[in-house]
Swiss-Prot record:
<dbReference type="InterPro" id="IPR000194">
    <property type="entry name" value="ATPase_F1/V1/A1_a/bsu_nucl-bd"/>
</dbReference>
<keyword id="KW-1003">Cell membrane</keyword>
<feature type="binding site">
    <location>
        <begin position="167"/>
        <end position="174"/>
    </location>
    <ligand>
        <name>ATP</name>
    </ligand>
</feature>
<keyword id="KW-0375">Hydrogen ion transport</keyword>
<dbReference type="GO" id="GO:0005524">
    <property type="term" value="F:ATP binding"/>
</dbReference>
<dbReference type="InterPro" id="IPR038376">
    <property type="entry name" value="ATP_synth_asu_C_sf"/>
</dbReference>
<dbReference type="InterPro" id="IPR020003">
    <property type="entry name" value="ATPase_a/bsu_AS"/>
</dbReference>
<dbReference type="InterPro" id="IPR000793">
    <property type="entry name" value="ATP_synth_asu_C"/>
</dbReference>
<dbReference type="Pfam" id="PF00306">
    <property type="entry name" value="ATP-synt_ab_C"/>
</dbReference>
<dbReference type="GO" id="GO:0046933">
    <property type="term" value="F:proton-transporting ATP synthase activity, rotational mechanism"/>
</dbReference>
<keyword id="KW-0066">ATP synthesis</keyword>
<keyword id="KW-0067">ATP-binding</keyword>
<keyword id="KW-0997">Cell inner membrane</keyword>
<dbReference type="InterPro" id="IPR027417">
    <property type="entry name" value="P-loop_NTPase"/>
</dbReference>
<dbReference type="InterPro" id="IPR005294">
    <property type="entry name" value="ATP_synth_F1_asu"/>
</dbReference>
<keyword id="KW-0139">CF(1)</keyword>
<keyword id="KW-0547">Nucleotide-binding</keyword>
Amino acid sequence: MSDDAWLAAQRKVLARTAPAPYADTLGRVERIGDGIAFVSGLADAALDELLRFESGASGFVHTLEADLMSVVLLDDGATVEAGARVTRTGAVIEVPVGEGLLGRVIDPLGRPLDRDEPVATVKRMPIERPAPAIIDRDLVSEPVETGVLIVDALFAVGRGQRELIIGDRATGKTALALDAIVNQKHSDMICIYVAIGQRSTAVQQVIESVRRYGAPERCVFVVAPAASAAGLQWIAPFAGVTIAEYFRDRGQHALVVIDDLTKHAATHRELALLTREPPGREAYPGDIFYVHARLLERAAKLSAKLGGGSLTALPIAETDAGNLSAYIPTNLISITDGQIVLDAALFAANQRPAVDVGLSVSRVGGKAQHPALREVSGRLRLDYAQFLELEMFSRFGGLTDAHVAGKIARGERIRALIAQPRFRPLRTVDEIALLAALAEGVFDAAPPAIATEARAQLAEQLLGAGMAAGWMDAPLDPATQAALVTTVREIVQRLTLEAANVPARTGSGK
């Protein structure tokens, strides 16, 4: 088509066009309080739609009624007054995603909290997205190496799994999740930490710990502290999962820690009561299970056809006096693929991490565990559980049987090995060597303190012996197992001699 013909066609189009003013529906704030605005006049507004107030504040539609809707504010409610005008945006809440977020601290709307420099992203995604369909998922077959011996050996987490970390207040829940993040320093996983309703000082400590021990350039921190609006706290986990989904959908692997969903449930209850939704058990609204289920179902291992990426979720929940049968804990336990239960009594006894081996479980991660690690950790849980039971009865006296004494001695060495300091992750090869040596009785004659010291020195010794190869993906062959056990035995014997102030012998120490 020539330029003249095109120009003539456009003139005909313009001739048929009747200019008219653009009509925009305006709403009105009828009343406002506690972070909730009740708005009238927007009959066409949709649920979860983003609205703008004339002061510049924003909020999303939470409930719809015949002539009134409740809008949850995402900003300071002091700038919104009754009688103010409200306009629709025709869009839902979106969050920026992409490589530009790595190393940054943002709020759930993507606004920077660490510095004035804006976030360098070019793409935005809605925070509410459907979970992958069953046919789009693959089996959980690759491990997430947390570096925590008791977790990797007994309650292994796989890529694409949802493993709940639950326990009373101040029992090391965040510390355990933080150790898992720090251990990804040399892996290919992108880590997203979501803080909901936490103290700003506590969040700052987490960020500083990752910067000191981990790889902050491969982490994203989504923060909605206790002082922020309830609406921001409510959308925080959805924003964090959306950021993680961006990397998962590109064939990469992401780990998201949500700290914590108990506070998120309390925020959801607060918003429901303020908007006069019917309360249910423990005053939570009836949809609280659905809210958390649709969030955590987005964690998945995608099929090879979709790139094979994964999103692993480590949600955290807080219990009251160890009550796992409360409403929110039972909901989350039924939604997730397992739970790591932290016990306050173990924590008080200086057993850290304070994992309760009797109540903890990983339903799918065992299939993703390294075959060599699975082989050497087979009896660990049973031996340790028997030790805890025998130790309790031995306090009353009367257990003088040599077999019982041997089990108690073995259990004390197990406890010394799994009592792991923070920010001291173990490589998988170190874990295999320790457990193989434990099964061979290397630690039986040594004091528990020797086992702890041997664990600290093992990594350097194995690197020097060239034992850090990727042989863990196959069953442990006898020659490799013997080499690992010999290395650990030499360390234990040397430490034992040093403790007795006897010069260490040279040679193999056999």
